Amino acid sequence: MASSVSGAEEVRVSALTPLKLVGLVCVFLALCLDVGAVLSPAWVTADDQYHLSLWKSCSKPAASATWRCNSTLGTDWQIATLALLLGGAFLILLSFLVALVSVCIRSRRRFYRPVAIMLFAAVVLQACCLVLYPIKFIETISLRIYHEFNWGYGLAWGATIFSFGGAILYCLNPKNYEDYY
């Protein structure tokens, strides 16, 4: 968007482009999904006899009506999974705050690259977490009943996908398309 000032001088005003706004919405959704994934009580469930989250593991013997719960922070792979997911969530939070601040001030372009880099780093951390979790779960915990990865695990994948989408949108060069808006 260009406007003329005092006849001959032209000033460029940085407008918020729709793709950056959609990127900000993607980052916000990723943040919300990450919070849901971290707080979820159901990453793995098995026929109302076993529940595993990032924080605790609960099992109920078939003959009993009471659940026995233990902390999952005793094994290395579960601590690593939690650390990778929380690290990615922290980077998503930081990139959301930087992107939000960049919307409020005039010089937005200089914040696009750091936001995209933080989001790509969050995607790498969370993808490592989401690949590590089922591999180590199947390797270390032997359930003789049908089990499935539940909605908490799915929320974490959703957060990773939205983070990747936001990172792609923040990588797009606004110089190529901002004259059309």
Swiss-Prot record:
Q: Provide the protein's localization.
A: Membrane; Cell junction, Adherens junction
Q: Please give the GO cellular component terms listed in this UniProt entry.
A: adherens junction; cell-cell junction; membrane
TM ranges: 21-41, 81-101, 115-135, 152-172
**What topology does the record note for this protein and the membrane?**
Multi-pass membrane protein
UniProt keyword terms in alphabetical order? Cell junction, Membrane, Transmembrane, Transmembrane helix
| Disulphide-bridged cysteine pairs | none
One Pfam family, please name it. PMP22_Claudin
Give the highest taxon in the source lineage. Eukaryota
Primary localization class, coarse: membrane
* InterPro entries, per database record: P53_induced, PMP22/EMP/MP20/Claudin
Q: Name one GO biological process term.
A: cell-cell adhesion
**Protein family:** Belongs to the TMEM47 family.
Q: What does this protein do?
A: Regulates cell junction organization in epithelial cells.
Could you identify this protein by its name? Transmembrane protein 47
